[in-house]
Every structure is written in C-alpha cells, then in structure tokens.
C-alpha cells in the first residue's frame, strides 16, 4: 500500500514554498545535483537509436527512455520499480525523470563564468579591483598575474607579459608565484578576506574627496557586502564542474529520412566535452606548455559559448551560419523561457473562429457554433452520458459523440445551460478584452457577438476572430459569472463612464427616431398615452417625427397626470424606459452623448439589472428604426456652399498682400509663412462654417404656410450630428475644402487643397494628399508596436500595486483645482474630484461648519453640493501621498471606477492603471491617418476675449503704462482671472510678455470684451523707461546686418548668430541701452539696475541708434519658429518621455534659490547669471549664449521659477518644488496628450504610475543604518530599517525622493523574477545571484510564474490566510503549517469576496 501512496505522492503537488532564492552554486552543490558524469560527446547510436553510455543522453545517468523499462530490456513493468539493472546500469523509473535529472562534466582546468566576467560592471573585476581588459588577458592566456609575490618587490594582482615574467624568474627564481588562466584568478579570489576588505573600505570612505573614487569605493563595498551577507564565495564565480541540463530539455528528435533535429545546446555541450577530453589527454601526456595553454583557452571559449554565445568574441555558428542558441538565449527575450512559457501559456479547452454580429442576442449571451461547443465541452458530455447510463464506459461515450447521435445534442444543451464561457479578442489591451457570456447554440461556424460589447473589445465584423475558453472548475465558473460576465462590466475601468454604449447604426436609429419635423402628418394632436400614439403611428395616421402632446404621469413623486409635448418617436422610446426614469431624459434628440448620459444615470439610479435590460432594448429599437429610416450616402448629400469660391478668392488676395509685404521687407520669411498658414486655417474654418450651415438646416413650409428653417434630414449630416460615424472635419473634406496638408517632415505645406472630394482633386492636389495618407499607414504600424511596448513597461512597473488596507491614516493629499487652459475650463472641479476621498475639511466663506468632512467619499450628490457652493479647490487623498508600505489603501485610491463604490481590498489597481493608460495609446496610434494627414493646427491665439461678466484681477504681472494709456506686460508668469460677484474664480488666462492690456486691475468687464492682445509670431523686447537708444556692440557687418529691401528702401537691423560671426565679433555681446540726452545711464524704476537689453540671435531692431523711445515701446522683436502640426505622433512618444522621466533636450533652467538676478562676467559661449539670496549668499548658473533668457537684470525670482525658456525637466520640478508639483505636472501633461484625442482617463491611474516612479529614496544621511550616503533604496526598505533602528534607540536614515523612469523603476524592483522577465535578463540574474537575493513573491508576475493564485482579487484572501498560517506556525510551531487549501476553502473565500463586491448594489 505504501508503494502506491508513494506513486501518488510523486504525481502530486511539489512541496509548498514561500520565497525563491537565487545564489551562486558551489562545485559541491553542482556535484550533489548530478546523477553521474558525462564523459563522452556521443549522443545516440544512429543504428539502434539507443543512447550511448556515458554520453550526453546516457540512460544510466539520466534515467530510462521508456517508462519502467531498462535499456537492454532485461527488466520491464511496474513491479521492478526502483531496481537498477546489473547489465546496463539503468534504474527503472518513469521516463519523465529525464526532464529533471542533471549530469555534470568535471573540467580538467577551471573556467571563469562569463556572466560574472563580462556582465557590466564585471563582478570579478570589481572584487579584484582589476580592469576587465586585464582579467581577460589573464584568462585567455595572454599575460601572467602575480598570485603570491612572496618576499619580492612585485605586487599581488600585477600583470606580467612573457618577457617581464622571464625577467622576474631570472631575478627572483621561485620566490614568487605568477600564473595565467582561470586558476590564477580563482586563487586571487580565494585570497580575498571579505570582512577585512569591507572594514578597510568603510574606513577609507569618509577620508576621500574625489567623486569618482567615492563612486568606485561605494560600488565595490556594495558588492563585497553582498557576497559577505549572502554566504556566496567569490571563487565560485570560477567553475571546476559544469552542470549538464537534463536531456529531455535539449531533445534530439529523429526526422524522416534518417536525419535528426537537435537542440543547439547539444552541439555546445559536445564542443565542451571534446575539448575537455583532449585537454585531459594532453595533461596526461605532459604536453608542451604552449599546447596545453591553447587547449585551456579553447575550453574557456567553448564554456563561454555554452553559457552565453556571442557575449565575447564572435558567436559560434552551426552548419547554416546562424549563431547557436546558448543557455542565456534560452531564457531571455520574447521567445525566452520567461515570457514565452512562464508568463504566457497555451491553454486547453479553447477554440477560435470568426465573429459575426448577433443583433438578437441579449447582453449576457453569445452565439456558439454547435461543432465548437461539442468539442469544447467533451469531458462534460462524456461524464453526463455515463452518469445517465447511456454509455457504459468513457470509450463508448466517445464513440457516441463521434457519431453525433441525437441524444448527444440533448445532453450538450443540458451541459451548456448556465455554464459561462470566456470570449477573448487579441490584442487584449485591457481587462474588458476578456469577458464571460452564456453560450447559445447556433448553426454555422461563426461565433455571434453582441453588438454592444464591441466597443470594449474594439471589435468589428470585417473578419475579426475571437477565442473561446471554458472555465472548468466550479470556482472558475463562479468567478466568470460574478466578475467577468459582460453584464457586470458596464462601466469602463479607465474613466468610470459607461462602455456598453450604442454606436453606429443603433445611434443613427435612435437619433432618427427622436428627431422633430415641422409640419409632419398629425402635428399638434393629443393622445391619452404613449401606447395610443404608437397604435395611430402603426396604422399610418401619424408621421414618426410629428410633434404631438401626450398625457403622462407626473414625475418627482407627484401624483396625477400632465400633458407633455413630444414626438411620436420619443413616445415609442418611452415604452422601453425603466419604471421611474424621468421622461424628459429622452424627450430630446438622442445623440451618442445623450444616450451615454442616460445609460449612466440609469446605472446610478436603478443599478445593474435595469441598465442591462434598458441597454438591450435601446439596441433592438435602434436597429429597427435605422432600418426603417433608409438613411444612405449619396453624392447629392454632399452640399457645397454657394459662397465657397468668394471666400477662397478673398483668402488668395490676402495671401498676395502678405507676399508683397514680404517682398518689401516688412515681414520676415518666417512671419510670412506663419501668417499664410493662419489665413488658410481661418479660410478653411469659414468654408466649413458656411457648409455646415447649408448641410445642417433646410427650408420647409410650416402648417401656416410660412417658410421656416429646421435641422436637416441630410443623411451625412445626421450621421455626424448623432455621433454615429464621421465628424465635421470629415464632412468638411467631402463638401467644404480639404485644407492644409502636412509634409512628410510634419511641417505644413503652405499651398492648401481648395477642392473637396465631391468636386475631386487635380493631380497636384492628389499628390499632396498622398503624403498624409502614406505617413498615416507607416505611423500606424510603428506606433502600434510603440504603444504595446509602453503598455508593457507600465504593467511591469505597476504590477504589484494592490489595495492592501482600508485606510493608511494619512491626512495629506494633493490640491485639486479646475483645469483651465487658454481661459476655457477644460475639466471642471466636480469631474476631477468625483470618486475621491476628501483629505481635509472643506469650508466655504459664509459658513463656520465644514461643507464636507475629511474622509468623505465624494459621489455624484456630494460633487453637486460642491458645485452649488462654488468651491474652487479641494484637498483630496491620492495614491501619491498614500502611506501604505506594500500596496495602497482604499481611502487614498477612492472609488473603483468600474463598480462605482469604494474600492475593495485586493483590487489590482496597478494593472488597471497600466491598462487604462496603455489601451488608448494603441487606439491613438491608429488615429492619425483617418483625416488623411489634414493639418489640424489651431490658429495662433493673439488675444484674450472673456466669456463671463465679472471683475478682472491681475496676478503677479509687472506692467508699464504706454503713452496711449494702455498697460504693457513686462513679466512672464503673469495671469489674469475673472471673478464673479461672490469672489469665485470663473476664468483664468496666462498673459505673455509684451501683451497690451486694455483693462485696469479690479475694473468690471463684460462678456465678449477683449482685454489683452499680442503678436503671436514674435517675442517683443519692451522698454520700461523712456530715453534715447544707444547701441552697444552693434557693429554693422560684424554683429548685425542691415537688410535693405531694393523695392522699398526700408532697412532692418538683424543680429547675426555668434557661430557665423568673424573672429572680431565672436565675443561681442550686442545690446541696446537707454540713456539721457547727455549719455548717462537710465536706471529701472526703484533699482540701481541700468535699463539695458541684450539682443539674442535673429532679433530685429525697430529703432535706429540715438532715436527717442517711449515707455512700453517695442525696441526689438524676435521671430518665433514655425509651428509643427500637433497630432498624436507627438503624443505617444510624449507620454513615453514623461513616464520614462527623460531629461528634455535644452531643458528650461529653473531658479535654484529665490533672490535678485544679475549678470556676472561671461565665459566663452556662456553667460553667468547670479541669483543673490542675501548679502553673503548667492547661486551661480552658466547658461549658453544662444538660449533665450527670460529674466532681466534686477528682477526678483522665486525658487523653481523659469530663468531660461525650454521644456521643463521633471527632476528639477521634484527637487525644487516637491512631490505635489511634480505629480501635477506629469498628470496634466499626460492628460493633455489624451485630451487632444478626446480620450478620457481618470487622473488616479496616472497617479498610481507616478507613485511607482517615486518608490526610491536617495540616502542623504545614513545615521546608524546599513545604507551608504548617495545610495538609492526602496522607501519601504528605508522605513523598515528605520523602524528597527528606532526600536534599538539608534539614529535613523533620511532620504529625499528621487524620480525614476518606468523602465528603471521596473528593473529596480525588489523582486528579481519580475525584473528578469522584463528586460536585461542576464544583468538582473547576475546581480541577484551574487547578492543571494530572495524573492518574497509579493507581486502578481512572480506568482503567475510559479503557477500560484495571484495575490489580488479573489486570490488575495488565499494569500492572506497562508500568511496568517505561516505566522501561527512560526509562533507556536503549528504542525499544520503546510496545510493545503481545499476547494471548499477557496469557495468560501470566494463567496465572501463576492458578497463584499455586491453589498453596495
């Protein structure tokens, strides 16, 4: 009996483990793994196909080829299990032991492990403090190294070439020991006393001053400590014994025709064995030194190739000239072990087929072809047949199924009932790419999909395929039904808006149904109920668009009835409204946006079930009336506006005017270009406006016979207006003008396409169009790949963020304000704070009690309240400020967007964040070419026109008053706000330098008033005092050119680029200063700073030397570069740059301290800018001369203010302005890109990623901790160490947050398994092995790879209970520590989790 149990045990689960450790293997360990030495390079006997003895496939070493059968055939059958055959020496066991038994090769000479030698920084090099180059010379037998100097003057580790060695031999004889090859290196490593070295280095650190030295010592110290603490011995990096992989992991497969297909590893092993055997023979024969050396070098090279082919020298190639795949190649890359087999596996019980539309399905159903169902549910059918006694054995059942007997189909129906299946469409970019449905059996071979889930899957029916998976166990079916069912995923986890929203035909149908028509059949009649109106319509007495009145029950809890004005179509729609839903929700024209809102409110008001039923009904109705409407596209429907030709003619004249100005030298080429582009952009808008007004309305006769205009029933207009398909931009190309096009480099071609598609393009226009079209296709291919890679990096960095506790107890958060851009409120406050938890009480000026208490979760009702009270800023909890050590707390995260209540513990919010940001990335990549590259460039803003009545307030604007009484702004970061009578901010605008402000501070303004204007194409230099202009260093032909125009004789002074000046003008600094008539300097008001203005390259001076200049005059202007088109091409890389925290090229220079600015002595090519904080403290900044410095002498700057313009550097923001400002910057920048494409993502997803980028701290003060100053450590590690130190009453370590890009952050994660499977596998594993790292299996990825439930979602409770058991076992020596979890346990945990999930609904 015990034998039998033994077998079962073998088959069962391997023992449980809680962590995985990786370390260097000692030679003894390698020998203990081995089942025997591999002595011969032979593989199998090609005649008998039996493995050769002592060869690479030896049955004696690795186990039998067939189950329980020895090689010579003496013993067969299970009864001899465990016997070792005396003839062939094979132990009788299962053949699968050939997958786990290892062998070994005893090397005749030690060999260095290439990973520890060549993986930078070289570990062997660091330990010995030798350069990689030197070590390689020793290893590959080019030089001797002194191992033991004895009493000589030589030093340990000194290299000697042949001559030096011979000299030394002559001089000292046998006094010293110098050798070459790996043994020398091994002996050197052996001699290292780790404790001693560590002590010496720690003493040396404080005494050194040189940066490079400190860096080097720190690196070395870290490595030595890693070795010391992990118990690895340095000499183990040199191998005496080479392990041999089990043969079934490097198989040899016979092909037909007597040839064999083999794994490359066999070739590599054969090489090693051949060379090793030859070396042994040479050593036995006492061959000459030089031959032995060569053989040893070749052995070293062959072992290198086996471990990591191509890492050193040329890769060893096989028969067909391709490099052989070494052990390292086996595990790294997309095809490697990690990503191919551990993180992604193929699964059984699955099938795939093409999808077709299933307009009659309910939302929770999908149509499954009978053939597929029969195959997928086979085991269930077999057991049912047996259970019912229709088949005696499984074999008989199999026959019945193959014959497809009628009873089988009945049983299939039975099996399938209420058994959910999973549908997946690749690429699965977010969690809605896999959803569960109940199958409905259908004829045919295509899967039927419900149209409303297409948005989530991003599916269409042009040949897409989908995969079907069957959840087998009860738990899996339960999870599929309660969490993954399509009806449970109505809201998008990215934005919290409905994702089950009708689109395309359905929208068109509902739109058509709810439109009004003037003077339609039956207009003005009154009916007693919607039903009655419907009857009359069906009898043909009413038009569907007729305006009628219907008697309806009152809403808002009132009793009785009232008459409602509506149309017949809306009355039909009212029939499907959920009970209690106000009729005025749908008593309007239904566009896509309206429908989405209705579904959203339905979900919030009535919950899930009603919403699902309602969505389905909407869909059926939409399809029905889209068919009835008969909408189609015809050439006639593209109506070209009558005044198009005159508008274009007018634009042509304007362009001609500008061209002539350019020829007269009044404007530069850059300005001309910008102005031409602006004219054409504006013209395009005008044509579009005129076209839209023509297409959008039509003239009809009303009941009284008067002519009136109504919204038109033009099908093209209806499609765009309803949001079903197409946009105004596309209609503009069909019937307006195509407009400006972008050239391949992204610049705008200044000749627009004036034709549209209905008129047709001429050859030239067609040709310009092809640029955009082709670029679109090329971009799409490239960017899909880029976007996928971005998603992968995001998932990797955020994978272990799980909600682990309810409340971390922090009272900090981030301040939320409405997002204002160019004066428009892009995102109002109530949208931004919805679903967040308030961090501190919210007050309003008129009350002493808080409106909202801290700790409140803001739902729809609360944000309405905030809106009503006009609150314009709220401090909310954020993932960035959450204090939880591992993971996040529910309060800091807030609402689970896909469920609409506070997030549950165990929710994998990191993955969801990564998917939410990555998924639209892939959508965006597809977007560019839809408009065929039509340049979408906003006309440059040149004024501020306000939208609401109020009072104007100027904020930190420095102004001077021009002689015409207008204010001119002479500061950079100024803003104006408009406040209403309650003092609430309504609008906010940035005011650029040089803007003319036509309203005074605190003066009342009206809506529509223009309060500031400026020239968008140039940067002006404004004079702040009046006086005479004096040129300094402006020398004609050296630092400036006079560009005179032949036609007009006007001349402009233009500053020459320093790089193009002659030697004389190289160091001159052109500037203008204002002086009195006597020539004395004039100072800026209230300072001792002279009024002087440095002129940058290309500046155009407006005045001559000595002319009079008034306050606020423009002395010079600097032309701005032409603008490139903004489309998402800038978008995706921009998002990647932000998340990678890359330092932008020519980044803005920010003030390190607050103080007064003045300019110091210049150096070659740079200017010295000094900020004086106080009398004795100042900060210097060197800025290249070509940079545009945006502050003037004597100006006061705040810490973190921009001194020289450029893109902001996130690292600077973090250093100077703190975590809050950085979070704001990254969130807003990322959102800008997505907003441009009309994609909604909730801020918290970006915040979760930012949190992960800020995980590390740089140690600024080490205290009594084990850290070194300047070391980067995980915040959690620092806090844990500090807890320990506090408990012992020692000094704690302090550190400042540091920003890491997502790739760096992923690689710097605590888990080496996760990092190795992400990128740079070799480096990660080398590092982990040296320091003997332990992976606690905290994240999701690690657990997937070891084949466990992930510690998130329903698996979270499982992991928690295991943790608790471990703790109990550790405390009380509990014997049931390794208790296995039973199915009922999991089921119990699951139902608990699901109850927690459902108790809000």
Swiss-Prot record:
Its EC number is 2.7.7.6. GO terms for molecular function: DNA binding; DNA-directed RNA polymerase activity; magnesium ion binding; zinc ion binding. Gene3D superfamilies: 1.10.132.30, 1.10.150.390, 1.10.1790.20, 1.10.40.90, 2.40.40.20, 2.40.50.100, RNA polymerase II, clamp domain, RNA polymerase Rpb1, domain 3. It comes from the Bacteria. InterPro entries: DNA-dir_RpoC_beta_prime, DNA-dir_RpoC_beta_prime_bact, RNA_pol_asu, RNA_pol_N, RNA_pol_Rpb1_1, RNA_pol_Rpb1_3, RNA_pol_Rpb1_3_sf, RNA_pol_Rpb1_4. Binds 1 Mg(2+) ion per subunit. GO terms for biological process: DNA-templated transcription. Mg(2+) binds at residues 460, 462, 464. SMART domains: RPOLA_N (SM00663). Keywords: DNA-directed RNA polymerase, Magnesium, Metal-binding, Nucleotidyltransferase, Transcription, Transferase, Zinc. GO terms for cellular component: DNA-directed RNA polymerase complex. Zn(2+) 2 binds at residues 808, 882, 889, 892. Zn(2+) 1 binds at residues 70, 72, 85, 88. It catalyses: RNA(n) + a ribonucleoside 5'-triphosphate = RNA(n+1) + diphosphate. Its cofactor is Mg(2+); Zn(2+). DNA-dependent RNA polymerase catalyzes the transcription of DNA into RNA using the four ribonucleoside triphosphates as substrates. Belongs to the RNA polymerase beta' chain family. HAMAP family: RNApol_bact_RpoC. The RNAP catalytic core consists of 2 alpha, 1 beta, 1 beta' and 1 omega subunit. When a sigma factor is associated with the core the holoenzyme is formed, which can initiate transcription. This is DNA-directed RNA polymerase subunit beta'. It comes from Legionella pneumophila (strain Paris). The lineage of its organism: Bacteria, Pseudomonadati, Pseudomonadota, Gammaproteobacteria, Legionellales.
């Amino acid at each position: 009996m015990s034998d039998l149990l033994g077998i079962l045990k073998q088959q069962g689960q391997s023992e449980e483990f809680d962590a995985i450790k990786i370390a260097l293997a000692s030679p003894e360990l390698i020998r203990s793994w081995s089942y025997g030495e591999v002595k011969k390079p032979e593989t199998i006997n090609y005649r008998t196909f039996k493995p050769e003895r002592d060869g690479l496939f030896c049955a004696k070493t690795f186990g039998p080829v067939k189950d329980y059968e020895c090689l010579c055939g003496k013993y067969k059958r299970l009864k001899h299990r465990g016997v070792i055959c005396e003839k062939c020496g094979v132990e009788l066991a299962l053949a699968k032991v050939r997958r786990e038994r290892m062998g070994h090769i005893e090397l005749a000479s030690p060999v260095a492990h290439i990973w520890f030698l060549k993986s930078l920084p070289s570990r062997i090099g660091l330990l010995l403090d030798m350069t990689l180059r030197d070590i390689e010379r020793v290893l590959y037998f080019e030089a001797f190294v002194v191992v033991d100097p004895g009493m000589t003057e030589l030093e340990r580790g000194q290299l000697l070439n042949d001559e030096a060695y011979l000299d030394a031999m002559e001089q000292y004889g046998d006094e010293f020991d110098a050798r070459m090859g790996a043994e020398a290196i091994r002996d050197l490593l052996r001699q290292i006393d780790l404790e001693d070295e560590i002590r010496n280095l720690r003493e040396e650190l404080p005494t050194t001053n040189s940066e490079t030295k400190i860096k080097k010592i720190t690196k070395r110290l870290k490595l030595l400590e890693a070795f010391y603490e992990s118990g690895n011995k340095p000499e183990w990096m040199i191998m005496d014994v080479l392990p041999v992989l089990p043969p079934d992991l490097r198989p040899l497969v016979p092909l037909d025709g007597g040839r064999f297909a083999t794994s490359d590893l066999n070739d590599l092993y054969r090489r090693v064995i051949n060379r090793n055997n030859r070396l042994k023979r040479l050593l036995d024969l006492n061959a000459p030194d030089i031959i032995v050396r060569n053989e040893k070098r070749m052995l070293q090279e062959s072992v290198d190739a086996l471990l990591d082919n191509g890492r050193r020298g040329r890769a060893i190639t096989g028969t067909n000239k391709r490099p052989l795949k070494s052990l390292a190649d086996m595990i790294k890359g997309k095809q490697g072990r990690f990503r191919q087999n551990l993180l992604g596996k193929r699964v059984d019980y699955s099938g795939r087929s093409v999808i077709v539309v299933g307009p009659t399905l309910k939302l929770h159903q999908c149509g499954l072809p009978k053939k597929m169902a029969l195959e997928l549910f086979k085991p269930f059918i077999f057991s049912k047949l047996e259970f019912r006694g229709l088949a005696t054995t499984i074999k008989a059942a199999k026959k019945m199924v193959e014959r497809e007997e009628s009873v089988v189909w009945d049983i299939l129906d039975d099996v399938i009932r209420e058994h959910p299946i999973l549908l997946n469409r690749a690429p699965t970019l977010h969690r809605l790419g896999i959803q569960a449905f109940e199958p409905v059996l259908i004829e045919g071979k295509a899967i039927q999909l419900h149209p409303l889930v297409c948005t989530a899957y991003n599916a269409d029916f042009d040949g897409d395929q989908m995969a079907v998976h069957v959840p087998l166990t009860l738990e899996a079916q339960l999870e599929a039904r309660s969490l993954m069912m399509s009806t449970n995923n109505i809201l998008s986890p990215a934005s919290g808006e409905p994702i089950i929203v009708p689109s395309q035909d359905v929208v068109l149908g509902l739109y058509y149904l709810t439109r009004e028509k003037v003077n339609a059949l039956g207009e003005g009649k009154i009916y007693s109920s919607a039903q009655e109106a419907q009857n009359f319509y069906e009898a043909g007495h009413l038009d569907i668009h007729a305006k009628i009145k219907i008697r309806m029950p009152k809403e808002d809890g009132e009793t009785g009835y009232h008459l409602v004005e509506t149309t017949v179509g809306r009355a039909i729609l009212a029939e499907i409204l959920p009970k209690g839903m106000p009729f005025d929700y749908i008593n309007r024209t239904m566009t896509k946006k309206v429908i989405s809102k209705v579904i959203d409110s339905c979900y919030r008001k009535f919950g899930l079930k009603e919403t699902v039923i309602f969505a389905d009904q909407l869909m059926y109705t939409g399809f029905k009336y889209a068919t009835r409407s008969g909408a189609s596209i015809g050439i006639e429907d593209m109506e070209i506006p009558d005044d198009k030709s005159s508008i274009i003619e007018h634009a042509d004249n304007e362009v001609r005017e500008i061209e002539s100005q350019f020829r007269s030298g009044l404007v530069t080429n850059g300005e001309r270009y910008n102005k031409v582009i602006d004219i054409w952009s504006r013209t395009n808008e005008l044509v579009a406006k005129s076209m839209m007004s023509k297409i959008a309305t039509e003239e009809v006769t009303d009941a009284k016979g008067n002519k009136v205009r109504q919204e038109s029933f033009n099908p093209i207009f209806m499609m765009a207006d309803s949001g079903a398909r197409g946009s105004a931009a596309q209609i503009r190309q069909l019937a307006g003008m195509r407009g400006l096009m972008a050239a391949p480099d992204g610049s705008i071609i200044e000749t627009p396409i004036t034709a549209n598609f209905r008129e047709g393009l001429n050859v030239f226009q067609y040709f310009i169009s092809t640029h955009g079209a082709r670029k679109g296709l090329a971009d799409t291919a490239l960017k899909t790949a880029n976007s996928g890679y971005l998603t992968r990096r995001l998932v990797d960095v955020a994978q272990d963020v799980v909600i682990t506790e309810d409340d971390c107890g922090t009272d900090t958060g981030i301040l939320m304000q409405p997002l204002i851009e160019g004066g428009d409120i892009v995102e109002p406050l109530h949208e931004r704070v919805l679903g967040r938890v308030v961090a501190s009480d919210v007050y309003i000026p008129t009350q002493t009690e808080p409106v909202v208490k801290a700790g409140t979760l803001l739902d729809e009702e609360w944000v309405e309240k905030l809106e009503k009270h006009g609150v314009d800023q709220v401090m909310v909890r954020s993932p960035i400020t959450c204090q939880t050590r591992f993971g996040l707390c529910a309060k800091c995260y807030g609402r689970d967007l896909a469920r609409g209540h506070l997030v549950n513990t165990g929710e994998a919010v990191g993955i969801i964040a990564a998917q939410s940001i990555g998924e639209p990335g892939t959508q965006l990549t597809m977007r560019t070419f839809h408009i065929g590259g039509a340049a979408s460039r906003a006309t440059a803003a040149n004024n501020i026109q306000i939208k609401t009545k109020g009072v104007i307030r100027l904020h930190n604007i420095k102004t001077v008053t021009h002689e015409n009484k207008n204010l001119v702004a002479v500061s950079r970061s100024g803003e104006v706000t408009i406040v209403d009578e309650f003092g609430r901010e309504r609008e906010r605008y940035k005011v650029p330098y040089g803007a003319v402000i036509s309203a005074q501070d605190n003066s009342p303004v009206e809506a529509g008033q223009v309060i500031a204007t400026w020239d968008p194409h140039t940067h002006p230099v404004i004079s702040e005092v009046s006086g005479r202009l004096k040129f300094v260093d402006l020398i004609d032909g050296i630092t400036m050119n006079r560009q005179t125009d032949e036609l007009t004789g006007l001349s402009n002074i233009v500053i020459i680029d320093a790089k193009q000046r002659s030697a004389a003008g190289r160091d001159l600094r052109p500037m203008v200063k204002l002086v009195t008539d006597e020539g004395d300097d004039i100072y800026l008001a209230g300072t001792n700073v002279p009024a002087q203005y440095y002129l940058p390259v290309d500046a155009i001076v407006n005045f001559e030397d000595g002319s009079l200049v008034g306050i606020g005059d423009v002395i010079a202007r600097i032309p701005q570069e032409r603008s490139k088109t903004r489309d998402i091409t800038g978008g995706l890389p921009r998002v990647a740059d932000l998340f990678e925290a890359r330092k932008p090229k020519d980044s803005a220079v920010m003030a390190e301290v607050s103080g007064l600015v003045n300019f110091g002595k210049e150096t070659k090519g740079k200017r010295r800018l000094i900020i004086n904080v106080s009398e004795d403290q100042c900060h210097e900044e060197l800025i290249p001369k070509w940079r545009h410095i945006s502050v003037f002498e004597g100006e006061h700057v705040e810490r973190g203010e921009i001194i020289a313009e450029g893109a902001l550097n996130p690292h600077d923001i973090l250093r100077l302005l703190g975590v809050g400002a950085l979070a704001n910057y990254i969130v807003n920048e990322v959102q800008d890109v997505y907003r441009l494409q009309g994609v909604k993502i909730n801020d918290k997803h970006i915040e979760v990623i930012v949190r992960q980028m800020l995980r590390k701290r740089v140690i600024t003060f080490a205290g009594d901790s084990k850290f070194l100053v300047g070391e980067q450590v995980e915040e959690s590690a620092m806090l844990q160490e500090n807890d320990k130190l506090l408990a012992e009453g020692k000094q704690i370590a302090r550190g400042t947050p540091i920003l890491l890009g997502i790739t760096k952050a992923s690689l710097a994660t605590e888990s080496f398994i996760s990092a190795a499977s992400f990128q740079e596998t070799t480096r990660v594993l080398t590092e982990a092995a040296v320091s003997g790292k332990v992976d606690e299996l905290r994240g999701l990825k690690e657990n997937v790879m070891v084949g466990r439930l992930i510690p998130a979602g329903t698996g979270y409770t499982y992991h928690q209970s295991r943790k608790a058991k471990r703790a109990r076992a550790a405390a009380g020596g509990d014997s049931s520590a390794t208790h296995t979890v039973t199915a009922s346990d999991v089921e119990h945990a699951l139902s608990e989790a699901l109850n927690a999930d459902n108790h809000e609904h």
